């Protein structure tokens, strides 16, 4: 291998300081900044560990994988700029993006430019419903997660008066509507369905409305910054309402915001892959670097790299890799993964968990 090239820039930062001519560059795109940067931390932790492990075992036919980090801040406009930067940098493989609202516009560019994208986090069904050939994911869909939440609400919680809140974004509103649809199919109507503004911090009006309407259950579609504030302010006002949210709220930063008010929150998310015995060596390696292995996107990202590895061992052509994966079963840290023709995982299941004030989650009963 020859021709050392230093990878640097305001947007792109290499996880490895040097790349060589025979190295295989992989764009790892997520939020390094902005209100949900914690999810980017999970993604980059998983990517770094997966690439280290793949390279330690010989890489791709002797060539090393080199990750190049890009920050889209989970912002659609910045995601488009990043996607164009990836194109200009000549990278053919993308792990990312994270948020559905930024993943979808970026995927338009990747598809047009012949770049393979495997997202470890974007759950919007629309992403893979457009006939694209180069888009896959290693997570489930809102159309899976919403019914899982609705089923638990109907069968386990059985509340009397339900409100559904969302952050007016593709991910949050899509999930909220999926939950609402699931409840309606179960014969239950919600008292109100409404949106808040992402970034908002004062929820006194919402809390007053919940109290006035005697709401005993709230489903929130969105991310942890707003969920944390809603929990904290609701408990401060004396509300005993049960709250529930998706994997977008299941972040230790939620507990930092809500404190003890986070205890007992219900969340739907992928299983706790850090608790799988076979994954212990990976958990130990991540902990040795003073990083947190518990985040869901650590593992969906690791699995995305394993999937890319399987594809690259077959071909270096993005279209051929996508075609290969849609007919293959890949052994990963999440278990065996296989995809349908749209690029969605077959048989992916979300679980329901109790969230605790210390930032951990246990299986809900």
From Swiss-Prot:
Keyword Transport present in the record's keywords: the answer is: yes
Question: Which keywords does this chain's UniProt record carry?
Answer: Amino-acid transport, Disulfide bond, Periplasm, Signal, Transport
GO biological process, alphabetically ordered: isoleucine transport; L-leucine transport; valine transport
Record's signal peptide? 1-21
Give the primary localization class.
periplasm
Compartments, record wording = Periplasm
A Pfam entry, by short name: Peripla_BP_6
Task: Give disulfide pairs as residue numbers.
Answer: 74-99
Sorted alphabetically, the Gene Ontology cellular component annotations on this record are: outer membrane-bounded periplasmic space
Q: What does this protein do?
A: This protein is a component of the leucine, isoleucine, valine, threonine transport system, which is one of the two periplasmic binding protein-dependent transport systems of the high-affinity transport of the branched-chain amino acids.
Provide the family line. Belongs to the leucine-binding protein family.
Name listed for the protein in its UniProt record: Leu/Ile/Val/Thr-binding protein
Which species does the entry assign this protein to?
Answer: Salmonella typhimurium (strain LT2 / SGSC1412 / ATCC 700720)
The top of its lineage is:
Bacteria, Pseudomonadati, Pseudomonadota, Gammaproteobacteria, Enterobacterales
| Gene behind the chain | livJ
